[in-house]
Amino acid sequence: MFQNLIRGCTAALLAALAAFPLHASPLKVAFVYVSPIGDAGWTHQHDLGRRAMEQALGDQVKTTVVEAVAEGPDAERVMRDLAAQGHELIFATSFGYLEPALRVAAEFPAVKFEHAGGYKTAANLNTYNARYYEARYLAGLLAGRASRTGIAGYVAGFPVPEVIQGINAFAIGMREANPKAQVKVLWLNSWFDPAREREAALTLIHQGADVLTNHSGSPAVAQTAEEKGVKLVAYQSDMRRFAPTAQLTAIVHQWGGYYTAVARSVIAGRWKPQPVWGGMKDGFIALAPFAGDVPKETIALVEARRRAILEGRFRPFGALSDAQIAAMDSFVPGVSGPGPK
């Protein structure tokens, strides 16, 4: 299932697609977002990808955005309306949009759907995701070197495999730097709730965490780290504007290349459902610049591991297969908090 996942994003494919005739009219592309676009976070990064696609393709595409759409019936209604309005490509950018997207895709077989983080496909629905865990491991190495208490706090959305992968990879990296380190997890059961994200961050600080990270959609954790004087590994966006002294680095999502490639494939008539799980070497994720107070030897360690990942010489989860990683549902040693099951 996971073989040849990233071919749709290669330079060779982009060059090949450019040789095919384009639509006579702009391709109508819609993006459905689970939270407001805002200034940073999950949805903001997807919208940066949309804008990069527009910049790359110009008048070949015309985009529509619907933001702050709840998972469930609202998402289904919005996607159905977009399909009925003549959108030919719809990006459903939240995990809980999968079942609604599958239902709408069955009703509109001529419309192409791309779902972020899903695990089911259809004749006209593809899934895509990033190997966030690669950068999470590197961030854990950095956190393990930076923490004085040996405790990191992790504010997490829902206990789905993608989130569990990130928690485990972070813990593996942190414990490589400090074998006694702990990662304490608090679940939000929400992807975007700034008030609860802040509350969870404060609780983790009270429990001894002097480094925070998160898998949630607002800058609240970053702002709390800055306010309380603890360190931060930001997620989704570079949060230096919110945490100029707290941020060590950030795990940055980059969707522009993928969105551009998908739109080009639809325009060229070459689109097909071929699940994509891209990593750091594919440009889906990157580390933001390190803070000025990160020691040179720590940077050297993280960079050495990053190069090993890029070159395929190191895998954070060792011999686990892609299928095993994709189904991850339990914590590794060093993680504490309510279990994912």
Give names to the regions the model predicted.
Residues 8-21:
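Bacterial N-terminal signal peptides
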Residues 1-5:
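N-terminal secretory signal peptides that target proteins for export/translocation
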